[in-house]
Amino acid sequence: MLLSSPTNEHTIELAQQYAQGEVCYPVKFIYGHMQELAEKNADYIFMPSIHTMKHEKSGVKHNYGCVYMQTAGRLVAKNLRLEERGIKLLSPVFDLDFGKKAMASAMVQTGTELGFAPPKCMAALLTGSAAVKKYTDSMEAMGKELLDSLRPDEKVLVLITRPYDMSDPVLNMQIPKLLLERGCKLINLEHLPGHSIDISDEYPNIYWPFGQHILSGAKLIKNHPNLYAVYLTNHGCGPDTMLSHLFRREMGDKPYLQIEVDEHYSPVGVITRIEAFLNSLEHHKTVSAGSAIDIKNVSVKHYDVKRLDTDTAPVYIPYLGLYSAMAADYIRSEYGRDVMIMSEISEKQVELGRTMTVTKEYVTFTGLLGNVLETAETAGGKFNVVIPENEGSEADGVFARVISALIEEKGLADRVGIISPMLESLPEKAADTQKLFCGMLAADIAYSVPRDRRSEFICEHIPDEAELTELAKRASLIRSEGKTLRITGTPMSIYSLGSHILDFLEDKGYILRYMPLSEYFRFLWNDSGAECKKLYEIMHKISQALGNNSPFAADTDVLINAADERFKGFAGANGRYRYAVITTEENCSAVINITPRYENVSFVHELSGMSCPVPIHRISVDGDINESELSSLNSFLYYI
């Protein structure tokens, strides 16, 4: 058996040579380690895919690995051409949320691929599981022993990060060594009983187990007068862009050091920051607890989630093109609330949001935050904002909770509430799912016609099925001449942040086929196991009525099969649907894919070698009207 070397200069060199795209630093190192093993003539390379993970105190439906953990092994193997080189990838899919049986099945299958009998595989698995538990218990016991022995004025630093950052000599930037050389007492997150803390009442939708552990660790550190955090995050990590805000919230006025791991980091800069932090701690007086400390006795505050059916305050909803008016009508008619549509996200709002950012947050988050803050400045009295959640595993499902935390930080929590319906649960929990779906279809129909005729198809109220069918038949009669461009991406990138791009294209006379939001949600709900047969029947009927103007897939099964081919079981930002739409699109001149800059799912799609039957141009929006971006788009259009 071969192990790759501890990360060294050669690993970094290989990573820089083979890694593609703006992936996070740890994923870049996977390229280096797997290429090293390939150069050593390995027959097999073991790199599992982490789909879900177990976390005992979690309250979410599924505890997901990030989008890279779900896909990295397969994507890196493809880019390194391992199969062509005669090297087999062993990449069992770990679905630890489904219990020990699922884990055992995945590992036994891997063992049998290597020629071992199932009983021998099970024995090895049990031995390994026992060793992990023994290690976990011993680490927490060591931590307790240290904390019990501390003098009242002693300070202990706790390294907070993911396990792979903790142990890797490059990813941890030698910080443990630097701290120990300076005489610090140092432990890490594994020495604290973070797994026994239930934070789900305060953070109900943190679906990353490492994120849950980091936040429970933050509570333990905040609660113990002798503990101070050194928090390492990863450049390019979507989850870290959200967790950093919540970690800061937990620390409050207690000093801590946060350093972002980046391939361009300066060792001198790291040392300077460490020494400045240690110097500040010398002047920070440790407050004696006065008695024995129960470190687990942490404060977990109830997160007050507002509800449409019980909270009577006026409601604001984010701008999402024509879909916003349909959503507003739905809320008014079903819940009797006063509803206002927020303005389209502007450059000014993005800049306002950036006054509270800490790293490279997606512009969909930054713009939405700025939009909420500006609304709070102009709206009088109390109001609620609808910011949907999803079940994971991209950063977007946590936007609502983080924006709520930042509203609290700004002192606006008494005026501004957040309503965050779970998107996957809408078929079960919406007051009238079919009506909501018909509202999406109404906007889909309006977007199926050219801009100069669109006003004829905009509805004031949500039509019923029969009215939708007649509307679609009318739309089918409109004929347009010119090249057709398929518009794909994330809904907010297309319908709010990317409107200047769409105007640019329509000004040039291109026919745009917009990604239909009804199909987007129907696919998401199908993936989550919801019963959507009736909704599909209505959508199919509208698609047929639209004829050649239909933006819908002719056969939904084609989309599902395309998604399963490369991203079976994948969870994150409806990435399966977005991938399938692009890779099956044939009835247009080109695809324009609009996504937020730095979005991890977009990078995963690119790394997958996503092929499109027609030319594709990718645009990463970042909240401004970028002339070079439009120039690049113009050049692309010239050749189609």
Where are the regions a protein language model picked out?
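An N-terminal assembly and electron-transfer interface module characteristic of large anaerobic redox
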Residues: M1-I640
